[in-house]
């Protein structure tokens, strides 16, 4: 993964001050918010479909510092996508969520605005997230020229038993 520039590092540092890592307790619903920044690769499968992988890092409530991989398929004519968020916390616990998304152009050439709605998978998540449920919305910008993305997410997560 490419090194993040100072602007991205600064943005993550600001969010770190706002998004203190916590933990969920059985039966409690908690906010799930954070930010991410990373690199994007895409491979054309056919004229209408790209296979895209985001490899990023960030900080979030409930996760703390994390790495995330986001493999997904993009339907180019409709600008829609479907795939998975695979968060890995510093201790190795994993939070998995399926998502669908929509991309729209911005006023900046080569930069796309993306909104993705994700649902946490209680069966695929591990460690303290095993059995957890919830959902979140990711809003991010994708710079197709630089091959980078930066964004934030907000939602809720509940521990097993909720």
Per-region residue spans from a language model:
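Beta-strand-enriched cores of mature, soluble protein domains
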Residues: 25-162
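Positively charged n-region of N-terminal signal peptides that target proteins for export
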Residues: 1-5
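An acidic-aromatic pocket/loop used at catalytic or ligand-binding sites
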Residues: 22
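Bacterial N-terminal signal peptides
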Residues: 9-19
